[in-house]
Amino acid sequence: MGIQTSPVLLASLGVGLVTLLGLAVGSYLVRRSRRPQVTLLDPNEKYLLRLLDKTTVSHNTKRFRFALPTAHHTLGLPVGKHIYLSTRIDGSLVIRPYTPVTSDEDQGYVDLVIKVYLKGVHPKFPEGGKMSQYLDSLKVGDVVEFRGPSGLLTYTGKGHFNIQPNKKSPPEPRVAKKLGMIAGGTGITPMLQLIRAILKVPEDPTQCFLLFANQTEKDIILREDLEELQARYPNRFKLWFTLDHPPKDWAYSKGFVTADMIREHLPAPGDDVLVLLCGPPPMVQLACHPNLDKLGYSQKMRFTY
């Protein structure tokens, strides 16, 4: 004699299954809605972002905060990449690269720390910086064109890099246990992006060594951020400064980047070493590369932003 199933029991089971299915679908949709959306979907497209805030960082540097499309958007910038800002000034197209000081953990906004080069201040650049002065003139609510991600280097974690020799070449994998960095002025922003990405992962064994060059002590941007990271991760991050015009009680190096500075504060040449460079072209070409040559760092051990 077969087992007869009660219609009431079947109905109850059906309702239960529908309820469970509904809960599963609802949970999936909630998780999906909470997943951050990416702003930079196409590196060839321009995205208009609105200025939210502008604050003074130092005597010649400001932090610009731009709103992303929604509070749940991230910029969508891989570590190692940068963005371009573009605008027309006096009828001419002006494009400049920048690396945000925020990351894709920050939702709803992106921050840029930029030195404002004013007209008539520097004798070599009497007109000042076109883009930086334009940004400084913006009012809250004004929009700027963003484009990206751009760049030849990507950090994928735990010492692994993908580096393109040029824009048309495929990326080549590179592994570094020790990361040397030489930055000048606002060239610190891509370094800080990378340092933060490495240090926030306890399992990342990469050691970071930064030599940061500036003209005067008041020109050192993001110093508090760097010194906080050094204090928090003393075994993973080493920080050293050099100034062209240091104060009397200066505890770090003086003058342009030299071979001795590199030897003392960056990892020695080796297959597990990568040295990153970002700063004014004269510093990179006339001070950094010749001294790296002198100390035996091969071209494969270097990358210039």
From Swiss-Prot:
GO cellular component annotations of the record: cytosol; endoplasmic reticulum membrane; extracellular exosome; membrane; mitochondrion; plasma membrane; platelet alpha granule membrane
Binding residue positions for FAD: 136-166, 175-210
Superkingdom of origin: Eukaryota
Keywords: FAD, Flavoprotein, Lipid biosynthesis, Lipid metabolism, Membrane, NAD, Oxidoreductase, Steroid biosynthesis, Steroid metabolism, Sterol biosynthesis, Sterol metabolism, Transmembrane, Transmembrane helix
Domain FAD-binding FR-type: 44-156
A GO BP entry: bicarbonate transport
Names of required cofactors: FAD
KW Cell cycle (keyword) present: no
Pfam families documented for this protein: FAD_binding_6, NAD_binding_1
InterPro entries assigned: CBR-like, Cbr1-like_FAD-bd_dom, FAD-bd_FR_type, Flavoprot_Pyr_Nucl_cyt_Rdtase, FNR_nucleotide-bd, OxRdtase_FAD/NAD-bd, Riboflavin_synthase-like_b-brl
Annotated EC: 1.6.2.2
Gene Ontology MF term list: cytochrome-b5 reductase activity, acting on NAD(P)H; FAD binding
Location(s) in or outside the cell: Membrane
Reactions performed catalytically: 2 Fe(III)-[cytochrome b5] + NADH = 2 Fe(II)-[cytochrome b5] + NAD(+) + H(+)
Record membrane topology: Single-pass membrane protein
Keyword Zinc-finger belongs to the record: no
Transmembrane segments: 8-28
Family, as annotated: Belongs to the flavoprotein pyridine nucleotide cytochrome reductase family.
Record function comment: NADH-cytochrome b5 reductases are involved in desaturation and elongation of fatty acids, cholesterol biosynthesis, drug metabolism, and, in erythrocyte, methemoglobin reduction.
UniProt protein name: NADH-cytochrome b5 reductase 1
Organism: Homo sapiens (Human)
